[in-house]
Amino acid sequence: MAGAKEIRSKISSINKTRKITRAMEMVAASKMRKTQERMRASKPYANKIYEVIKHIARAASEYRHPFMSEREIKRIGIIVVTTDRGLCGGLNSNLFRETIRTIRNWQEHGKEVDIAVIGRKGQAFFRRVGGNILGSIDHLGDTPSINDFIGVVKIMLDAYYNGTIDSLHIVYNEFINTMTQKPFVKQLLPLPKSEEDKKTLGHHWDYIYEPEAKELLDEILERYIELQVYQAVVENIACEQAAKMIAMKSATDNAGDLIKEFQLAYNKARQAAITQELAEIVGGAAAL
């Protein structure tokens, strides 16, 4: 058994680590709440843009924007949203598993895949496993803006415009609740249609557009896709902070359990030392 002095040193070291993980847990909780607020703030704006797109598309029914036109899919683009840092449990590894599963499924059906990566962890992963990377960006921080990653988005939109890819998807972690985050693959292009959209397009709005509806649609559709990517990035950050908070709480709890174990070992070592000293005193007295 280790000596009492050595055990006390270990207890002190673990206690310092526990203070650090506790502080990191609190910071992650604070960042998660702020990111959730940004998530909520962007949704009404995105919903309203989508409504406007549907109205304008109805007004310019003779014009089929490439983003809204189905085509034969031979090559698929995917934007993979990951974190820059670790210490967030299995968040990235779960996302990578889902991404690889999705890519392999497409490849089994004869589709080629082009990839754009957001986040250092994704860059490192695809350098290791390989893949046709069209663009990447990292170091977005905890409060990114659309301008921070607009270059990567533009690369993929240009690839869609010129026919290099025929479909565009994004994969990111979906925030279910503080304890649960799961990988989610979402189609961006061509713009998916729902039954509700078909009902909406069946109505007529008599609006006058300035500039023309076609010009508005060209501009707004790009902004909408950029906003979809922004929402995915922000939601992924919320997932990162939630996972980090849980991981740090687990580390703090484990440190507490270790301290209890070492404290018990320290008490036993101290008791053994005292017993030894008493035995030596008694033995010395008996010798006299």
Curated annotation (Swiss-Prot):
Pfam families (alphabetical): ATP-synt (PF00231)
Subcellular location: Cell inner membrane
Disulphides: none
Description of how the protein assembles with itself and partners: F-type ATPases have 2 components, CF(1) - the catalytic core - and CF(0) - the membrane proton channel. CF(1) has five subunits: alpha(3), beta(3), gamma(1), delta(1), epsilon(1). CF(0) has three main subunits: a, b and c.
HAMAP family attached to this UniProt entry: ATP_synth_gamma_bact (MF_00815)
Similarity remark: Belongs to the ATPase gamma chain family.
Function text: Produces ATP from ADP in the presence of a proton gradient across the membrane. The gamma chain is believed to be important in regulating ATPase activity and the flow of protons through the CF(0) complex.
Protein name in the entry: ATP synthase gamma chain
